[in-house]
C-alpha cells in the first residue's frame, strides 16, 4: 500500500509493507506467515524503491505486489529500471510486471523477470480481498508475529548479545512486532458496509487502514 506524503490532517497516509513466507502443508494448502512488516511515513519515491529492492533481494522474494494506482505508478516505473544502492555499490536489475500488459509495455528491458503484481483497486477487488482476508484469518491460514509485549523475550532468545545492543538497535528489531500489533488493532476497529452486494471497508474517525490494505493485498496475491 503506497503513500509518499505524510499528513498532519489525516493519519492514513503511510506506505505499509508486509513480507509473507508461504509454507505448504501435506495437502498442498499454504499458510501465510507474515514474518516482517514496516510502515514508512513521508518517504521519498527513490528511497522507497531502494528499500523494496533491498528487501526483495535480502528475503529472496519471489513476487512483489504494488498498489499501482495513483502514487504507485511511478514506483512501478522505477522498479522496472536499474536501481543503484549507494551503500553496497550494487546495481539491482530491472523487474517487470506479471499481470498487467500495459505496465509490461513500459518496462524497457523485455527480458526482466516478471515478478511485480500491479494491484489496480476497484469496488469488486476490494470486496474480494476483504472476504479472502477474513476467511484466511478464520481458517488459521495467516500467522502473525507474536505480541510486542513478548518480543523482547523472543529476541533475547534468538539474537546473541541482544542486551548489549543500543536502544535504537533494539527498537529497530522490535518495530515489526509493534507494527503487527498496530495492524491487528486496525483490523479490529474497521467498519464494514455492504452496498450493491459489495463489501466496503472504511476506518473510524481518527483511525487508519494502511496496514489492513497492505495485508489484504498481500494475502490475496499469495
Name each region found by the language model.
Residues 94, 98-117:
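Long, structured stretches of catalytic cores involved in phosphate-ester chemistry, encompassing
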Residues 1-101, 127, 131, 144-148, ...:
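RNase H-like, metal-dependent nuclease domains and their acidic two-metal-ion catalytic environment used
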Residues 113-132, 136:
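Conserved RecA-like P-loop NTPase helicase motor core
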